[in-house]
Amino acid sequence: MVVSRGKTPNAQETFLQMAQASGLRGRILITVGLLILCRLGIFIPVPGIDRVAFSNDLQGNANLGGVIGFLDIFSGGGLSALGVFALGILPYINASIILQLLTAAVPALEDLQKNEGEAGRRKIAQLTRYVSLGWALLQSIVIAVWVTRYAVTPGPLFTIQTALALVAGSMFVMWISELITERGIGNGASLLIFLNIVATLPRSLQQTLELAQSGDRSTVGGIVILLIVFLATIVGIVFVQEGTRRIPVVSARRQVGNRVYSERSSYLPLRLNQGGVMPIIFASAILVLPFSLANFTSNEVVLRIANYLSPNGPTPWIYALFYLVLIVAFSYFYSSLILNPVDLAQNLKKMGSSIPGVRPGRATSQYVQGVLNRLTILGAVFLGLVAIIPTAVEGATRIRTFQGFGATSLLILVGVAIDTAKQVQTYVISQRYEGMVKD
């Protein structure tokens, strides 16, 4: 995307224009209403489960609590409450990741996405729904079999009705997510995760306050250090999300009829973090997989692997290293999905634009690829460090009250907030230009 140089509205102007845009107000109301509806569904329980026994088991098993705590990021507490929305948006996110991987590997899907336009995107969206349904069905069966030990009347009927309730809840959440994306503001799936993370924040703050009131000076000092690190993490996330490298682009002089258009300069913005929050979500999902398998299978080998990959285990440096490698790998993957230097070079050539000092065509694609590689490795390593440092500080200070609201949650929160704010600004600008055209 080539951007011309011009004035960008500041935050105050955008807020005033947002307040005056009736269409935007309607979209915001739709978004808020659907988010509230989805949040209320968290408290609808799956029938036939002894919640007292489940709650006692959850509190007595640290590993189980850690797994449930991470998965609750995507369900907003639905899994720990065993509600019908227990799966949350996770099947849809997993399906989206699978389709993105297949699009990069299967030529037919790649052609569908690149060359079929809106019709191709609709087909991929439909495929994503089918994969979401299959993934939700698989997860719901596993959970239904697992919670049989807490059933009031265990048996095949309980397993079937529990699985169906979980699948129905997951599909309803997916539908709400797509409604928000189409008729609201922002990305529906991201906003649902955002809401679920925010829902866990009051509990973490309450536990931290109680710990500060009952603890000694070292405990209070540890809490202060942890909060400072969290604030620094937010600053680092904003830097990674907003950091861009502007490559100058020059459009050649051209003549249309009797008019001669002079050469104009613009720039090509390359983000420091092309993948946004997806690399961190995917890396976290991979890391939690051994814990899920360990709790569902009770296999000794899987338990040992999960223990070594735990940030609270005997070898936290293995967790940190593995987490960093996964973030870097997925950052490269998403960078290649979002921006193709060969296609970019061809588009610049068709528009009669070029990068100063670089020949059009293959040389341009190689130049952009080199810049993109350097940006990606820098952004990915910085993103990995931002994700690891708060966890390391938690281990050093032994303050675990933010266990469910760690660096991963902060990365997702700030990233989604920035992306949504940009979409609001884009909508306001487009409304302003539409008004100018009508006038």
Curated annotation (Swiss-Prot):
Keywords: Cell inner membrane, Cell membrane, Membrane, Protein transport, Thylakoid, Translocation, Transmembrane, Transmembrane helix, Transport
A biological process term (GO) from this entry: intracellular protein transmembrane transport
Keyword Protein transport attributed: yes
Domain of life: Bacteria
GO cellular component: plasma membrane-derived thylakoid membrane
Pfam families, per the entry: SecY
Membrane topology label: Multi-pass membrane protein
Segments traversing the membrane: 28-48, 73-93, 127-147, 156-176, 179-199, 220-240, 276-296, 318-338, 375-395, 401-421
Entry keyword annotation includes Phosphoprotein: no
Main location: membrane
Compartments, as annotated in UniProt: Cell inner membrane; Cellular thylakoid membrane
InterPro entries assigned to the protein according to its UniProt record, in alphabetical order: SecY (IPR026593), SecY/SEC61-alpha (IPR002208), SecY_CS (IPR030659), SecY_dom_sf (IPR023201)
PROSITE patterns hit by this protein: SECY_1, SECY_2
NCBIfam families membership: 3a0501s007
Quaternary structure note: Component of the Sec protein translocase complex. Heterotrimer consisting of SecY, SecE and SecG subunits. The heterotrimers can form oligomers, although 1 heterotrimer is thought to be able to translocate proteins. Interacts with the ribosome. Interacts with SecDF, and other proteins may be involved. Interacts with SecA.
Functional note: The central subunit of the protein translocation channel SecYEG. Consists of two halves formed by TMs 1-5 and 6-10. These two domains form a lateral gate at the front which open onto the bilayer between TMs 2 and 7, and are clamped together by SecE at the back. The channel is closed by both a pore ring composed of hydrophobic SecY resides and a short helix (helix 2A) on the extracellular side of the membrane which forms a plug. The plug probably moves laterally to allow the channel to open. The ring and the pore may move independently.
Family statement drawn from the similarity comment of this UniProt entry: Belongs to the SecY/SEC61-alpha family.
Classification via PANTHER family: SECY/SEC61-ALPHA FAMILY MEMBER
Protein name: Protein translocase subunit SecY
